[in-house]
């Protein structure tokens, strides 16, 4: 919906097979750039677009968006404080069936080490939409970690204010001395 109102939003992708992007690719072809399997170049393109005043979203598989292009991310989005939002899919062992080259267990540490980064690991579609709304309203260098699977909504009653201030205790706690702290997909198990 945001692309319908703002032609200064660009979406870059390194993922050839993401059927979820088909509609976006067709409807907004002038704002959708397919960069091929070239994550490093894609981050350089993103930096150039951001330097021209655009809001840039970059999408790729987690292990390649993080480790493969970390220097470009650090120098562009990080050191120049550019409004680039990185969206990775298949975090953790999301693509374990593809072997260890597709594991993404270091991505959080990589981006946490870059000055000015904001890292988000949504647990469902609802919280993902809140994160996107926040980033579109306040463009900044950010990293969104998505699971490979579509996760059912776990907390559809949260508001933008809850998101901005942090989440509270869910459920009833009766004199128990236990705390479960989680995020992303694992929140469903808690």
Regions picked out by a protein language model, each given a short descriptive name:
Residues 1-145, 150-151, 160-163:
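Thiamine diphosphate
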Residues 157-179:
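Condensing-enzyme catalytic core mediating Claisen C-C bond formation in acyl metabolism
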